[in-house]
Design a protein with these regions (language model features):
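Substrate-binding/charge-relay-adjacent region of secreted/lumenal peptidase catalytic domains
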Residues: 1-170, 192-242, 248, 259-265, ...
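Secretory-pathway extracellular proteins and peptide precursors enriched for disulfide-bonded cysteines
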Residues: 189-191, 198, 205, 283-294
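Phosphate/diphosphate-binding glycine-rich loops and adjacent basic-rich segments that engage nucleotide
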Residues: 178-194
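Intrinsically disordered, low-complexity segments enriched in Ser/Pro/Gly/Ala and basic residues
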Residues: 118, 184, 195-198, 273-274, ...
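Short acidic, Gly/Pro-enriched loop/turn segments at secondary-structure junctions
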Residues: 100, 174-180
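An often Trp-containing, charged/polar helix-loop segment at the C-terminal end
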Residues: 259-308, 312
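Walker A/P-loop NTP-binding active-site region of P-loop NTPases
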Residues: 254
């Protein structure tokens, strides 16, 4: 299990707000053989956590990302993976820069290190230059996950637009009655909105059958992306984070928990919709330039069955993974 971390913020970074813990002096630990506190105090000595550079080597590491947003991003990614899969062994692969070329190298390094699941909490607007690095995200035998973005319905995000990548959108949870105890809708608030889009570069894969997008549609699946508390010392303690940078590592962790990482990809989700909660409410129309319109189409509005903001739905156990 790996998460890639550039050293400065691009599009899909988690957005932080101050949050007060009811018991800030008591770090929370997760059950399982590989335990981390919410501030990631798991050490390399345990064998459960390590970090390497974009070549997969323990040194030299890039300069600290403190103050750039990526210190929080790394905390968030590792915390969400370990929440979903407490026994997963985690490797953070650090890129030298937030450019497409450096980021592409991190996935290759993760694959060479034997990671079964690779989580990418970043994205950029798709274009020809970004797509020139697509081969770096094609690794048979490895499940690759990427966040769909935090600015709602717009141009598809790279690398989430690739057919080899599980694209993850975002939802909001609220307390409700009933057996589940929650109601769920598309994430869209004053901080941002889960990404969705229709690729102008990547062909429609055979396993996607939505009708209003001729290319690859983002997203495939989704998870909670709002109001998640994380402890980060460089931010002075507990903060509340929003973004599909929450959702992507959660989904990656669920793949790790299921134990099928490396043998499944985005296409397998479409054959296991009964193991997903269908999200049917909400829109991700957040920031749309004049050239981008959606109306009430499934590309930006949740509805029964597949829709782009939440994909096929959110995990109901591990059956789809």
């Amino acid at each position: 299990m790996t998460c890639s971390r550039p050293t400065s913020c691009r599009r899909s970074c988690g957005r932080a707000r101050r949050w007060r813990s009811p018991s800030p002096s008591t770090p929370r630990t997760w059950p399982g053989s590989c335990r981390f506190t919410a501030s990631i105090s798991g050490t390399t000595a345990s064998g459960c956590f390590r970090k390497v550079n974009q070549l997969g080597k323990p040194s030299p590491l890039p300069p600290s990302g403190k103050g750039t947003g990526w210190d929080l991003e790394a905390t968030l990614d590792v915390s969400m993976i370990s929440v979903a899969c407490p026994s997963c062994h985690i490797v953070v692969v650090e890129a030298n820069s937030p450019g497409d070329r450096s980021l592409a190298k991190t996935d290759g390094a993760a694959a060479r290190l034997g990671a079964q699941v690779i989580s990418n909490s970043y994205g950029s607007r798709e274009n020809g230059f970004a797509l020139s690095h697509r081969q770096a995200y094609i690794h048979p035998g490895h499940t690759i996950v990427a966040s769909a973005g935090d600015v709602g319905f717009t141009a598809a995000s790279f690398p989430a637009d690739l057919a080899s990548v599980v694209s993850v959108g975002g939802t909001t949870l609220a307390r409700a009655g009933g057996p589940r105890g929650w109601r769920e809708s598309t994430w869209n608030d004053d901080v941002g909105a889960g990404g969705s889009g229709c690729s102008a570069y990547v062909a429609k894969p055979s396993w996607q059958h939505d009708r209003h997008c001729e290319g690859r549609t983002v997203a495939d699946v989704s998870a909670v992306a709002a109001n998640v508390p994380v402890f980060e010392s460089s931010y002075g303690g507990w903060v509340t984070v929003d973004g599909t940078s929450i959702a992507a590592p959660l989904i990656a962790g669920i793949y790790g928990l299921a134990g099928n990482g490396g043998r499944v990809g985005p296409q397998d989700l479409y054959a296991h919709t009964s193991s997903l909660f269908d999200v049917t409410k909400g829109s991700n129309a957040f920031f749309q330039p004049p050239s981008v319109t959606c109306g009430d189409d499934y590309l930006c509005v949740a509805r029964k069955g597949y829709d782009a903001p939440t994909g096929l739905g959110t995990p109901d156990g591990i059956g789809a993974f």
